[in-house]
Design a protein with these regions (language model features):
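Early transmembrane hairpin of solute transport permeases
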Residues: 3-135, 139-143
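Membrane-interface helix termini and inter-helical loops of multi-pass transporters
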Residues: 48-53, 150-163
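Membrane interface segments of multi-pass transport proteins and intramembrane proteases
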Residues: 121-126, 158-166
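Alpha-helical transmembrane segments
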Residues: 143-150
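Alpha-helical transmembrane segments and immediately membrane-proximal extracytoplasmic
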Residues: 172-173
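Conserved small/polar residues in nucleotide/adenosyl-binding loops
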Residues: 180-190
C-alpha cells in the first residue's frame, strides 16, 4: 500500500474532493466560459447585427466547449503536456456523447483519463506513444460507455429541479441563492 501511495504522490495524483470538486470544476467552468458562453455571445451578436462572420466565429467557439473544458481540467490537475493535449480528444468525445449533460460527462471522464495519463507519463522510453494512447483510450472508452448515461442522469436532475421550482418557487429560489453564496465563499481565492 505504501508503494502505491508513493507512486501516486510522485505522479501528483491527489485523490481528494477539493482537487476534483473545487480545482478541476473551477477550471472546467473557465474552459466552458472561454468557449461555449463566449461563443454564444459572439454568435448572438452576429445574429442581431446580421454579421455572418460573427455567427460563424461563435459557432466555432461553441463547438470547442468539450475540448476546452477537458484541457482546463487537465491544467488544474497539473497534467504533463502529452496528457493535456490528449485530453482534447477526450473532451470532444465526452461532450459529444454526453448530450445535454456533456459538461458533467466531460468533468468525470476527463478527471479519470487525466489521472490515468499522468500515471503512465514518462514511465517508458516510448512515452510519446504510450501516454496519448492510454489517455485517449481511457477517455474515449469511458465516453462510449458512460457519457450518455451521465448525460441522461444530468437531464433528469435538471427536470427534477424545474419541477421543484414550479412546486415551490420561493424555497427553490432561496436554495439557489444560498448555494451560490456558499460556493462564492468556498472559492474566494478564485473570485
Amino acid at each position: 500500500m505504501e508503494n502505491i501511495r508513493a507512486f501516486l504522490k510522485r505522479k501528483d495524483v491527489i485523490i481528494s474532493a477539493h482537487r476534483y470538486g473545487i480545482d478541476a470544476m473551477g477550471a472546467m467552468a473557465q474552459g466552458l466560459f472561454a468557449s461555449l458562453l463566449i461563443g454564444t455571445i459572439i454568435k448572438t451578436l452576429g445574429q442581431q447585427t446580421g454579421l455572418d462572420v460573427l455567427v460563424d466565429l461563435g459557432g466555432y467557439a461553441t463547438a470547442m466547449s468539450g475540448p476546452a473544458m477537458a484541457c482546463a481540467i487537465g491544467w488544474a490537475l497539473h497534467c504533463p503536456p502529452l496528457v493535456l493535449f490528449s485530453l482534447i480528444t477526450v473532451g470532444y468525445s465526452a461532450n459529444a456523447l454526453g448530450g445535454a449533460g456533456g459538461p458533467l460527462a466531460v468533468l468525470i471522464i476527463a478527471i479519470v483519463a487525466a489521472e490515468m495519463g499522468k500515471a503512465v507519463s514518462k514511465e517508458t522510453k516510448i512515452d510519446i506513444l504510450v501516454t496519448p494512447l492510454v489517455t485517449i483510450f481511457v477517455g474515449v472508452g469511458l465516453s462510449m460507455l458512460i457519457a450518455a448515461p451521465i448525460g441522461a442522469a444530468a437531464s433528469q436532475v435538471g427536470t427534477l429541479i424545474m419541477w421543484a421550482t414550479e412546486q415551490a418557487p420561493l424555497v427553490m429560489g432561496i436554495l439557489a441563492v444560498s448555494y451560490t453564496h456558499l460556493r462564492a465563499h468556498e472559492t474566494r481565492r478564485h473570485l
